[in-house]
Amino acid sequence: MSLAEFGIKTKSGKMERMSFGIARSELMPGAKNAVDVCLGVREGEQVALIADEVSRSVAASLEQALQDRGAQSTGLLLEDLGPRPLNGAPEPVLEALETADVGVLCMTPQPGELSARMSIVRVVERRQIRYAHMIGVTAEIMQQGMCTDYRLVDLLSDRLRERMLRAETLTVKTEAGTLFSAYFDRGLDWVKTSGLISPRYWSNLPAGEVFTTPASVDGTFVCDATAGDYFNGKYGDLQKTPLVLEISGGRLVRAECKRKDLEEEFWSYCHTDENSDRVGELAFGTNLGLSRMIGILLQDEKFPGVHIAFGDPYGSQTHADWKSRTHVDVLTRNCDVWIDRDQVIEKGHYQMNHLGLA
């Protein structure tokens, strides 16, 4: 199905808007921050705005912010393009991104849809357009994480990236039982996604991460917050039923949880392919505007601290030379974090003086 077959017409090569509905006033500050500051949308630019039914109110606020900016947007509702879960990226979505200056995706993930989202990202990276990936976004997030001062987030993220480019080890500890060390390959990049989006790096919104693919990780990671992909929506906050993960040589070797259904499903997911059990991402959360975790991965992974993910290493950004069909983040709470021997996070709070920002 093409854009024309879907019923979206163009005039003189410009994309026309399909309305997502009436924007809610309380979501507009976050929407304007996304459009004006994070994406830097300019008058006359072409924007592909993709959403699902659950995220429709968020899309409506972004649509209004784009209109206020003088941009031309194409709205695409995923449920109009085929059944969910998506087996692949719908053709009208890919076609819209092929001609857009800017792309935005707002959706709630469902099992088996990661490959469809990765197909969208491949178009974004090939064309090097500014792109916001808002997977799991809610009205609450628009009023919290999307109202952050992203220029401050960018400053902290820059300092952390500079430190980690020189670092040899990272140690993370929590009272819940997390204790692991990570080691790094100087040939792999540390990537900053601070919310100020450029053609070089697309970003989740809300933003605030500095991440790499670690050379190796050893120890215990207790996921007592949220897990990624569809696990977040299915199992929610894991504070009362933490997932205890043992890692050796950068690979998951054991998983334990009081909820045996979660334990078995997570273990199976992390053995989908030969690299699904491999730690593909280690990330700092750098969104200083967040005061608490809310049980939604999209925002909680930006909370000050360190988290990891098993599976695909985003090699197009980190330069890791391996791949996986899966990617699942795991989060923990109230981290103590040392870069080499210097403690930079204490109980989930950055020690700004240790980063030259006091």
Task: Report the location of each language-model feature.
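Active-site bordering "gate/hinge" segments
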Residues: 2-240, 338-358
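Structured core elements
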Residues: 171, 181, 220-222, 244-246, ...
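Short, acidic Gly/Pro/Ser/Thr-rich loop/turn segments
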Residues: 189, 228-230, 289-291, 315-316
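Dual-mode signal for accessory low-complexity, basic/Gly-rich regions
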Residues: 238-239, 255-310, 316-317
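Short, small/polar residue-rich loop motifs at catalytic or cofactor-binding pockets
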Residues: 239-241, 330-331
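Active-site and channel-lining beta-strand-loop segments
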Residues: 241-256, 336-337
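Internal helix-turn-beta structural module
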Residues: 295-357
